[in-house]
Regions:
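Flexible mid-to-C-terminal extensions adjoining Fe-S/redox cofactors in radical SAM and related proteins
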Residues: 1-18, 38, 237-295
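Generic structural signal for well-ordered alpha-helices
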Residues: 58-61, 86-89, 108-115, 143-148, ...
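Canonical Radical SAM [4Fe-4S] cluster-binding loop centered on the CxxxCxxC motif
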Residues: 8-56, 67, 235, 241, ...
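Short catalytic/ligand-binding loop motif for oxyanion handling, primarily in non-cytosolic enzymes
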Residues: 31, 41-44, 81-83, 106-107, ...
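Core AdoMet radical
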Residues: 19, 39-52, 67-82, 93-109, ...
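Residues immediately within or flanking Cys/His clusters that coordinate Zn2+
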Residues: 25, 29, 215, 267
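Ankyrin repeat (ANK) tandem alpha-helical domains that serve as protein-protein interaction scaffolds
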Residues: 43, 52-63, 87, 175, ...
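Radical SAM enzyme [4Fe-4S]-AdoMet core and its adjacent flexible, acidic
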Residues: 128-248, 252-255
Length: 295
């Protein structure tokens, strides 16, 4: 087991921060046509990222000084496809949430072999391991049964998009999850369906897929961190691979993070999760990740 100490100087994460998304990898074992991560540009399974090794992630993440109540959220892609995820979970000193589709390689035995599950033990108004069901890609009954096996020692639940095309399927999932004693929640569908726009957007014209304003000031309370350790201003920058606009790298000894307005020339290519009105990490409604000033 590696030491949780780091040789890098500490980095204070601004108090206003609501979320740190750690993209261990952009690889995924599913191929969903509706993947929100490929909203404007292909991000999933694009071979353009060097992935940090487990030892690098441990060094980088342990230097962070997080605001009270804010965990690290491992995501992707599929975070369990990173070969070092089990080593990371054993050695990172912070609480950790995981967004996963629960690939077949993730088993009860692998979790039981971990030297600690302390990373999973935090007070939270929602499951800290959030398993997503992807319609057309896997069997929700088998997924629920696997989650049920993990529930005795993990804070874990099932999530699915509340898509208007198949409310009957969502109700079936809800009933089966309740029958099996598994927590099931839906997430708001983002986008347009049969001429109707779903979700509430603070900036309704922000997600059209092309820049429509070249001089806005944007401040984000979310830090998306790419597989190579680069910290991006927003999800649009990450998915668009705008490395030249990154705020820095987690392994940079001189890294400093500031919560401030920054110039942006890409308004109109925003990702819905950054501009929608939603709940914050305390599940308080009315929060939006970004605040944008227009000239």
């Amino acid at each position: 087991m590696l030491s949780v100490e780091t040789k890098l100087p500490p980095v204070v994460v601004p108090l206003e921060t609501d979320y740190l998304g750690i993209y261990l990898t952009n690889r995924c074992f599913l191929s969903c046509a509706y993947c929100i991560t490929n909203y404007n540009e292909q991000f999933i399974n694009v071979k353009e990222f060097r992935e940090l090794e487990a030892s690098e992630w441990i060094e980088a993440l342990n230097r962070l000084e997080l605001p009270p109540g804010i965990p690290l959220t491992l995501q992707g892609g599929e975070p369990f496809l990173h070969k070092g995820i089990w080593e990371i979970l054993e050695n990172v000193r912070h609480k950790v949430d995981i967004l996963t589709a629960l690939p077949p390689s993730v088993t009860v035995e692998k979790f039981r072999k971990l030297k600690t599950l302390d990373w999973n033990k935090r007070e939270s108004p929602y499951p800290t391991i959030r398993v997503s069901y992807h319609k057309g890609q896997n069997d929700y009954k088998k997924l629920i049964e696997r989650i049920k096996e993990l529930q005795p020692f993990l804070n874990i639940g099932l999530f699915h998009i509340d898509h208007p095309a198949y409310p009957d399927v969502i109700q079936e999932i809800r009933e089966y999850a309740a029958q099996e004693g598994v927590e099931f929640r839906t997430k708001v569908f983002l986008g347009e369906w049969q001429g109707k726009v779903y979700a509430d957007y603070k900036y309704p014209d922000a997600c059209g897929g092309r820049p429509i304003r070249k001089n806005v000031q944007c401040k984000n309370t979310v830090y998306p961190i790419g597989p190579d350790g680069l910290i991006y201003r927003c999800h649009s920058d990450l998915y668009g691979r705008r490395r030249n606009l990154a705020l820095g790298n987690l392994l940079d000894p001189d890294l400093k993070l500031e919560n401030k307005y920054r110039n942006c020339a890409f308004y109109g290519t925003c990702i819905p999760c950054d501009v929608k009105v939603k709940t914050n990490h305390l599940q308080q409604q009315g929060y939006t990740s970004v605040d944008i000033l227009f000239e």
